[in-house]
Amino acid sequence: MSNVSTSVTAQYQLNPAQNTGLVAAVRGSIVDLIFEQHVPPIHNVLYAQNKHVVLEVVAQLSAQKIRTIALTATQGLARGMPVEDSGGPLKVPVGPSTLSRMFNVFGAPIDGHTYQHDGKWRSVHQAPPALTKISSQLQIFETGIKIVDVLCPLERGGKAGLFGGAGVGKTVLLSEMIHNMVSQQQGVSIFCGIGERCREGEELYREMKEAGVLDNMVMLFGQMNEPPGSRFRIGHAALTMAEYFRDDEKKDVLLLIDNIFRFIQAGSEVSGLMGQMPSRMGYQPTLGTELAGLEERIANTEDGAVTSIQAVYVPADDFTDPAAVHTFSHLSATLVLSRKRASEGFYPAVDPLQSSSKLATPTVVGQRHYDVARQVKQILAQYNELKDIIAMLGLEQLSKKDRDVVSRARRLERFFTQPFFTTEQFTSMKGKFVSLEQALTGCERILQGEFDDYPESALYMIGEIDEAIKPKQSATEKNSSMNSDLKPSNSESNSPGPKNSEPDNAIPSSAKPNVSQPNTFKQDAQNESLEEPQNGR
């Protein structure tokens, strides 16, 4: 509570409130007030109980009565208590001083450290960029992650949805995108946790700090235990900070929202408390307007771009749910994380066949990129269809063409795995940033059959494709060294010994090669190469 009081005082100390009212009714997070002199306008912030209770005006019921939504807990609030008008809307601090810090919806730091702000505060209620300022040029937002850049490229200044359950690597993937954004593109990352658990937010803060990406990052949290009004406004607060870096600092911003469904859920709670008539499946009637008010502020302008990656929860896996339908209409790319791929050890566990992007067209990504992505998806789809035949009849029953498809598809799957910088402390594997050009070149060489003779393990957890050649070269040199050590010397060959009845140039019967041995060894090696990777490897 002390943080909230300090933040409110910092926001409005230059404009002390003069207008006062009284509490008329308290119904959970909805508080009705009466102002006899001047009714505060919509979105004005009010406070009571020595600024410990913060309210926001959402409706004017009459000439003297207004309805507010509580942004803090309303314990202790009673009828007849005085309420002061702050004279302005909800504001948050902006500027370079916010970097590496964690804030709540009021702009108060919640990371346990003192905050020295530079006096720049901005309202969370901002209009979307004008159409004349929005850049119409479509550009790819390069993440450095092979499977994302090749198969489902993200749009610079666009919105991407990340669908995944618990334990499939969703947070790790978001963390890696933050790391690559800061280290490779010199941008700013903002993480907005809507309805996050306290434990998850604390763990993410420590992971970002240990990964060394916190210096160019801002974190905001509207925690799960907070009132719906706080969770409903935290997304707007994060966008206000992102817009400052885009418009004033002329920087590219990566905005990560987890979870956009909880934003919709908070709006539904507010709508129900206000007594609005629910729409289909119990959602608020203003669902489309509220979501558009948040999503339309994420745009690519001439000064910079705000690129958003949003975690989306689909209730009961029903993609016809109104929350999912309205969210899909704003997304330009969809990343689906597969639990099956995660259990097989393919990290990142992005499903290449279910993920898609609106930018995957020849006019945007280019003809070469489009052809490579189409061929990769075609081979992976054919391999997926052949899995049942392989399980029942075996690989030997396939034609030569189908065996080539299986071999190259499995090598593509392993090539799309990639060690991350944010997991170096857990895997002891150095992270890799792979450019789009390197990823496309690797896919082309695999599709052309250049790596058909290489073991599948050589392509697992590597960066660019040339790293797969080094293990084979080192293995060849090792075998050559072993063969030279086993070769008898001249002195040993000329040493006296028992005479053999066979001529000198004859091959002993015990050393004669078995004709069936090469085929057997080749088949065993082929079967061995088709084994699934172990978890974590």
Swiss-Prot record:
Q: Which residues bind ATP?
A: G164, G165, A166, G167, V168, G169, K170, T171
| Residue spans of biased composition, Polar residues class | 473-498, 507-528
Class of enzymatic activity (EC top level): translocase
Q: Report the subcellular localization.
A: Cell inner membrane
Note the superkingdom of the native organism: Bacteria
Entries under CDD domains matching the protein: ATP-synt_F1_beta_C, ATP-synt_F1_beta_N, F1-ATPase_beta_CD
InterPro entries per UniProt: AAA+_ATPase, Alt_ATPase_F1_bsu, ATP-synt_VA_C, ATP_synth_F1_bsu, ATPase_a/bsu_AS, ATPase_alpha/beta_chains, ATPase_F1/V1/A1_a/bsu_N, ATPase_F1/V1/A1_a/bsu_N_sf
What Gene3D superfamilies does the record tag this protein with?
A: 2.40.10.170, Bovine Mitochondrial F1-atpase, Atp Synthase Beta Chain, Chain D, domain 3, P-loop containing nucleotide triphosphate hydrolases
Q: Which reaction does it catalyse?
A: ATP + H2O + 4 H(+)(in) = ADP + phosphate + 5 H(+)(out)
* The keyword Cell cycle appears for this protein: no
What PROSITE patterns does its record include?
ATPASE_ALPHA_BETA
Pfam families to which the protein is assigned, alphabetical: ATP-synt_ab (PF00006), ATP-synt_ab_N (PF02874), ATP-synt_VA_C (PF22919)
Q: How does it sit in the membrane?
A: Peripheral membrane protein
Region of interest: Disordered: 471-537
Relate the protein's function as given in its record: Produces ATP from ADP in the presence of a proton gradient across the membrane. The catalytic sites are hosted primarily by the beta subunits.
PANTHER family listed in its UniProt record: ATP SYNTHASE, ATP SYNTHASE SUBUNIT BETA, MITOCHONDRIAL
**Protein name from the UniProt record:** ATP synthase subunit beta 1
- Name its species: Pseudoalteromonas atlantica (strain T6c / ATCC BAA-1087)
Kindly list the organism's lineage: Bacteria, Pseudomonadati, Pseudomonadota, Gammaproteobacteria, Alteromonadales
